[in-house]
């Protein structure tokens, strides 16, 4: 199995206290290839910083999270944000009411020409759009 991790799933890999962290780790451990968009790095760093500012994440946890993020990023196959992905993301944002980075994640995941790729996300709107596009899902339940 191959997996595309959006940022909501990626954060759960290095923040085990987050709900869903066990499932995210199980998906990571069982995948042959793990993919994400290069923009996930910015989103994940922003999430860590926001957690620190709101005092939900201690400074030591933020630093540990940043180190873990670096490790996961080195182990993943990164999808670059190309002009074609940007155009496709714009179309997907309009069609599905997605936020900008979520549309980039969906467009990136759709570039993978692999039959057994699962979109791993805890973002409900992205999950619905991925489902509509025919992707298999893991993470958030659509029920």
Where are these regions (language model features)?
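Short active-site oxyanion
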Residues: 1, 31-34, 75-77, 113-118
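Acidic, PIN/NYN-like endoribonuclease modules and their adjacent C-terminal/linker elements
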Residues: 2, 106-107, 111-143
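Acidic catalytic patch
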Residues: 40, 67, 74-96, 103-107
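Short, well-structured N-terminal submotif of metal-dependent ribonuclease cores
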Residues: 1-40, 51-64
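Helix-adjacent hinge/juxtasegments
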Residues: 49-81
């Amino acid at each position: 199995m191959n997996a595309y991790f959006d940022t909501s799933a990626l954060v759960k890999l290095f923040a085990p206290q987050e709900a869903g962290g066990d499932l995210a780790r199980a998906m990571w451990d069982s995948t042959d290839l793990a993919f994400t968009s290069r923009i996930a790095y910015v989103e994940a760093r922003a999430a860590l910083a926001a957690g620190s500012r709101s005092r939900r994440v201690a400074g030591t946890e933020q630093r540990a999270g940043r180190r873990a993020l670096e490790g996961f990023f080195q182990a993943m196959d990164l999808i670059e944000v190309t002009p074609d992905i940007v155009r496709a993301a714009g179309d997907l944002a309009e069609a599905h009411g997605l936020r900008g980075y979520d549309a980039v994640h969906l467009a990136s995941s759709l570039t993978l020409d692999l039959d057994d790729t699962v979109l791993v996300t805890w973002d409900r709107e992205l999950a619905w759009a991925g489902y509509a596009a025919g992707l298999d899902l893991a993470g958030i339940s659509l029920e």
